[in-house]
Design a protein with these regions (language model features):
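Residue-level preference for the first positions of well-ordered beta-strands
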Residues: 14-18, 37-39, 80-81, 103, ...
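Pre-Walker A adenine-sensing motif
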Residues: 1-14
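SF2 helicase catalytic motif II
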Residues: 86-88, 95-137
Length: 209
């Protein structure tokens, strides 16, 4: 695995779009451990819960958490770090007075563009709320066409950054057509259990999955 810490110096998340290129490289860990008051937004509640377990001094804001809990946390936390779902960001707006003191990190922001599990009004409200904060990092490890971003008012003039890794593991995905995906998946598992691993040749070397 590749981690941002490998760059050898403290990493500063930028104000704008950051294409990590590699998932799980430690960008949200930077946000949780740096010296800034930070709001980390994610569309995945389970991911937020996992991060909260790893960093118990954070505040987890998802459904069921009200503004009183947020205000109580802000009054006592020395360096507040808030983990929040996309659809709960609005709860923070009235509780945080000096928004210029804060940084916002939006993880998996490509979900705002393509995830059909989000209603359009949730996406629009989230983007409107994010405008309240002057420093926002939009994170993604998914290739996003620049032309596509340029068609969206919120992103078209935003600074765009990309991490440049010296070495990257190339993942090749093979699609299998089947009328019964469950049986096909079970068959693939059986192949692995029996030691029959798929392989490809790269630069003359056979590499197994």
């Amino acid at each position: 695995e590749k981690f941002i810490e490998e760059f050898g110096k403290p990493f500063e998340l930028p104000n704008g779009i950051l294409n990590k290129e590699i998932p799980g490289c430690g960008a949200t860990t930077v946000a949780l451990t740096d010296e800034h008051k930070t709001i980390i937004c994610s569309p995945r509640n389970e991911l937020l819960k996992n991060k909260h377990e790893q960093y118990p001094d954070t505040l987890l804001v998802i459904g069921g958490v009200d503004t009183k809990e947020i205000e109580a946390y802000l009054q006592t936390a020395e360096l507040p770090k808030i983990l929040v779902s996309y659809d709960s960001v609005y709860k923070l707006i009235g509780c945080i007075k000096y928004k210029s003191d804060w940084r916002v990190v939006v993880d998996e922001f490509q979900c705002l563009l393509a995830d059909s599990s989000f209603k359009s009004e949730i996406e629009l409200h989230f983007l409107d709320n994010s405008r309240s904060f002057p420093y926002v990092t939009f994170l993604s490890a998914t290739p996003i066409l620049d032309k596509y971003l340029e068609q969206i008012d919120h992103f078209k003039d935003m600074n765009y950054y990309q991490l440049d890794w010296e070495e990257k593991d190339i993942v090749r995905v093979y699609r299998e057509r089947t009328k019964n995906p469950i049986n096909a998946a079970l068959e693939i598992v059986r192949y692995y259990q029996n030691g029959n691993y798929p392989s490809v040749y790269v630069n003359g070397e056979r590499i197994y999955s």
